[in-house]
């Protein structure tokens, strides 16, 4: 088995919104990488022993006092270095070049760079040719400052009309700087540039692939837990499902999954989870029907934050009770993933590389005295999904739209009642079913229904009815930080509305939410 961590790239984060994207791109190329804050020590870099280092972007100005710098050792480690945006500027300044503050002539958005010299980073890459025969590349810029003089030993590799050094290189030392962002899709050949850097310049082998990651995870799990028993809170979500499958492969019946049905799940979800993991895959599952317990605890509570806390607290109580019944369990498995582990490196203290302990089970009791097993803690969400496919989990389950931890508890506005949850479940199922039928489900990033605790007059036949209102919500987004409401066809919305009102006794009106984020959030609560 090839060692998936044998070749690796270290990415130093200076606070750019794109930094995690760089890491995901390097991994897509097939190379393992880690993301650390910019102020790491020489000892930490030596211990990690990367085959190459990427200095990422950031919002600061190299010209400002106390702005972040790469550790000096980066340039003495004898490995290739790629500086992106701020990373290029700090590389230039630290090695003797000059950076000037942008005054009203920064570049933001699409730009075309003209190639001035050959470079291993840009080998055989070209988007267009200028009238005088120069290679041109379509890239994405986002910078105010710019390099005004490059360090000794470097050559200018590319320019734009306003940026004389859009790319620079010192081929002898294998140092490269690009003022644009190769990691975003708007830079058309960005993946090829990153591939040149990781595979050709750094000499990494593409060992990081789903089948190898699974083999490695199973080996490590066997080594970590030995013959001990493990307990896992299985929610039916992507992360816990993939953890369950990995552990099942590694230790079989020594895994006990606890599935808590809180009464706040989607239509038939509990049944589907039990059928898939229990009947189909043969996992050992304890099914706890706790609907009444959760609804009793939520009685009379309308505040969203308080509802979240109640749902979290009751879950922990139930999980703790079930864990105590598993008297031989020595380990608790969790679906922690890499973004949970990374603290954004743009922190004011500069101490962001201190890994945060992340409990996505929501603060389990300290007296559980179980060791922690986190087989996904190196993986991004898209990698977890690919591994899930490889492990045999169904595509439509792995690529389902996000569902909040508290479930319908935050999609029923105000107080949560069984009647409201039952109506909402059915309305939401109709909306999702129609999205699939119209081939729209995968064209939106997230779609769901919200129950509004308001009654509205409606007409059915000759009679009037006075029933509840639901709102449909569908958004398009890349990163869920900002989102646009989805412009679904009117006839489609009409069809969904008609079905909900005609098929569900208790709902008299359907509205469509046309708020973007910002100013609204994606979820209503």
From Swiss-Prot:
Claim: ATP-binding is one of the keywords in the record: yes
Reaction(s) catalysed by this chain's protein: XMP + L-glutamine + ATP + H2O = GMP + L-glutamate + AMP + diphosphate + 2 H(+)
GO molecular function: ATP binding; GMP synthase activity
Binding residues annotated for ATP, in chain numbering: 235-241
Pfam families (UniProt xref): GATase (PF00117), GMP_synt_C (PF00958), NAD_synthase (PF02540)
Alphabetized InterPro entries for the sequence: Class_I_gatase-like, GATASE, GMP_synth_C, GMP_synth_GATase, GMP_synthase, GMPS_ATP_PPase_dom, NAD/GMP_synthase, Rossmann-like_a/b/a_fold
Active site: 85 (nucleophile), 181, 183
Start and end residues of each GMPS ATP-PPase domain: 208-400
Protein name: GMP synthase [glutamine-hydrolyzing]
């Amino acid at each position: 088995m090839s060692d998936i961590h044998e070749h690796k790239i270290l990415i130093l984060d200076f606070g750019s919104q794109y930094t995690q994207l760089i890491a995901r791109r390097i991994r897509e190329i097939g190379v393992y990488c880690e993301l650390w804050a910019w102020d790491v020590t020489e000892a930490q870099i030596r211990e990690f022993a990367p085959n190459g280092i990427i200095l990422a972007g950031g919002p600061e100005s190299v010209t400002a006092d106390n702005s972040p710098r790469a550790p000096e050792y980066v340039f003495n480690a004898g490995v290739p270095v790629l500086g992106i945006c701020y990373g290029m500027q700090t590389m230039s300044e630290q090695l003797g070049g000059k950076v000037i503050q942008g005054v009203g002539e920064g570049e933001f958005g699409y730009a075309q760079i003209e190639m001035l010299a050959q470079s291993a980073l840009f080998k055989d890459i070209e988007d267009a040719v200028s009238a005088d025969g120069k290679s041109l590349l379509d890239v994405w810029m986002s910078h105010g400052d710019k390099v005004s003089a490059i360090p000794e030993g470097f050559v200018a590799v590319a320019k734009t009309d306003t940026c004389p050094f859009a790319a620079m290189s010192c081929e002898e030392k294998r140092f490269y700087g690009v003022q644009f962002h190769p990691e975003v899709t708007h830079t058309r050949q960005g993946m090829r540039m990153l591939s040149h850097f990781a595979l050709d310049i750094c000499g990494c082998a593409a060992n990081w692939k789903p089948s190898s990651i699974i083999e490695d995870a199973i080996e490590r799990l066997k080594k970590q837990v030995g013959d001990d028993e493990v307990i896992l809170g299985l929610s039916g979500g992507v992360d816990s499902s993939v953890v369950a499958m990995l552990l099942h492969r590694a230790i079989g019946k020594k895994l006990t999954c606890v599935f808590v049905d809180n009464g706040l799940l989607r239509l038939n979800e509990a049944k589907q989870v039990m059928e898939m993991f229990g009947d189909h895959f043969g996992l050992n599952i304890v099914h706890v029907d706790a609907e009444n317990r959760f609804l009793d605890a939520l009685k009379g509570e309308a505040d969203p934050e308080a509802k979240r806390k109640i749902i979290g607290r009751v879950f922990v109580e139930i999980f703790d009770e079930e864990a105590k019944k598993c008297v031989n369990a020595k380990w608790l498995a969790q679906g922690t993933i890499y973004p949970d582990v990374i603290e954004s490196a743009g922190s004011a203290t500069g101490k962001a590389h201190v890994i945060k302990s992340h409990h996505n089970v929501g603060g389990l009791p300290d007296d559980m005295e179980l060791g922690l097993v986190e087989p996904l803690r190196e993986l991004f969400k898209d990698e977890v999904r690919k591994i899930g496919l490889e492990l045999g989990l169904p595509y439509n389950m792995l690529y389902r739209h996000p569902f909040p931890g508290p479930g319908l508890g935050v999609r029923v506005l105000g107080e949560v009642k069984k009647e409201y949850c039952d109506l909402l479940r059915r309305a939401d199922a109709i909306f999702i079913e129609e999205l699939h039928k119209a081939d729209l489900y995968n064209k939106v990033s997230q779609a769901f229904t919200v129950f509004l605790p308001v009654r509205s007059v409606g007409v059915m036949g000759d009679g009037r009815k006075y029933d509840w209102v639901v709102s449909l919500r569908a958004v398009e987004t890349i990163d869920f930080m900002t989102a646009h409401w989805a412009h679904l066809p009117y006839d489609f919305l009409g069809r969904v509305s008609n079905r909900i009102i005609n098929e569900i006794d208790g709902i008299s009106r359907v509205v469509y939410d046309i708020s973007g984020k910002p100013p609204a959030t994606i979820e209503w609560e």
